[in-house]
Amino acid sequence: MASSGQPKVVLLDIEGTVCPISFVKDVLFPYALSALPATLEAQWDKPEFSQYRDAFPAEHASSQEALTAHVKDLMSRDVKIAYLKSLQGYLWESGYKSGELKAPLFDDVAPKFVQWKKAGEEIMIYSSGSVAAQKLLFKHTNGHPADLIPEISDFFDTVNAGPKQEASSYQTILAAHPEFPEANSWLFLSDNVKEVEAAKQAGMQSFVVERPGNAELSAEDREKHRVIKTFAEI
């Protein structure tokens, strides 16, 4: 473990850290797009859907066609904006519940969750995906146990914490848990070097996770940060 000692809290990214980036890009995103037209047709005027529709800018929520076009544009550019993330979570929910969607965790993830929890360490999640989408993913995995929600203490996204590449977001997360006041008792794991740097600026320990399919790390990245290939190295 790092010189600061065993962490009390392990804060985890999702894409490229606990599951392949390809799951989001090649499975979840296409599923949302394919489910969108029928969902809008069936739910457009229903009260339970209005919170998702009305969160969009007015010009894009004026019709089903306008909203669909805006969603396609945002997703083609991988824009991480809260109202899109909320709608995606809503669209994915039926797929997870039907069993059509199941999160393919890396083999070391579920066993390590159980190990961390038994050791008294808290597990928390910080992802650009909405908290609702995070909970769906961890409730429906290919791991053992398949439902990892009981192992997780809290969830953060860009709404309740802020942008993932800003140190202030990690300070917000720290402030949400005054029972763990020492920043260096937190360990943040992510495939994104800029996120790791932001967490370190906030005082957390942070490692870069190198998984199959992730972006190539530079020699400078490897020199500046501890890089792990599996949670078993922690």
Swiss-Prot record:
- Report the source organism: Podospora anserina (strain S / ATCC MYA-4624 / DSM 980 / FGSC 10383)
Question: Which NCBIfam families does this UniProt record tie to the protein?
Answer: enolase-ppase (TIGR01691)
The protein's name is Enolase-phosphatase E1
Subcellular locations according to the entry: Cytoplasm; Nucleus
Tell me, how does this one assemble?
A: Monomer.
**Name of the encoding gene:** UTR4
CC cofactor: Mg(2+)
Any Gene Ontology CC annotation: nucleus
The protein's GO terms of the molecular function aspect are: acireductone synthase activity; magnesium ion binding
The keyword Nucleotide-binding is assigned to this record: no
Enumerate the catalysed reactions.
5-methylsulfanyl-2,3-dioxopentyl phosphate + H2O = 1,2-dihydroxy-5-(methylsulfanyl)pent-1-en-3-one + phosphate
What keywords would UniProt list here? Amino-acid biosynthesis, Cytoplasm, Hydrolase, Magnesium, Metal-binding, Methionine biosynthesis, Nucleus
Role according to the record: Bifunctional enzyme that catalyzes the enolization of 2,3-diketo-5-methylthiopentyl-1-phosphate (DK-MTP-1-P) into the intermediate 2-hydroxy-3-keto-5-methylthiopentenyl-1-phosphate (HK-MTPenyl-1-P), which is then dephosphorylated to form the acireductone 1,2-dihydroxy-3-keto-5-methylthiopentene (DHK-MTPene).
Binding positions (substrate): 127-128, 164
Q: Which family does it belong to?
A: Belongs to the HAD-like hydrolase superfamily. MasA/MtnC family.
Task: Answer whether the UniProt record assigns the keyword Metal-binding to this protein.
Answer: yes
Q: Which CDD domains match?
A: HAD_EP
* UniProt cofactor note: Binds 1 Mg(2+) ion per subunit.
Mostly located where?
cytoplasm
Q: Which GO terms describe its biological process?
A: L-methionine salvage from methylthioadenosine
Q: What is the E.C. number?
A: 3.1.3.77
Q: What is the lineage of its organism?
A: Eukaryota, Fungi, Dikarya, Ascomycota, Pezizomycotina
Transmembrane regions listed in the UniProt entry:
none
> Its annotated pathway?
Amino-acid biosynthesis; L-methionine biosynthesis via salvage pathway; L-methionine from S-methyl-5-thio-alpha-D-ribose 1-phosphate: step 3/6; Amino-acid biosynthesis; L-methionine biosynthesis via salvage pathway; L-methionine from S-methyl-5-thio-alpha-D-ribose 1-phosphate: step 4/6
Q: Which InterPro entries match?
A: Enolase-ppase_E1, ENOPH1_eukaryotes, HAD-like_sf, HAD_sf
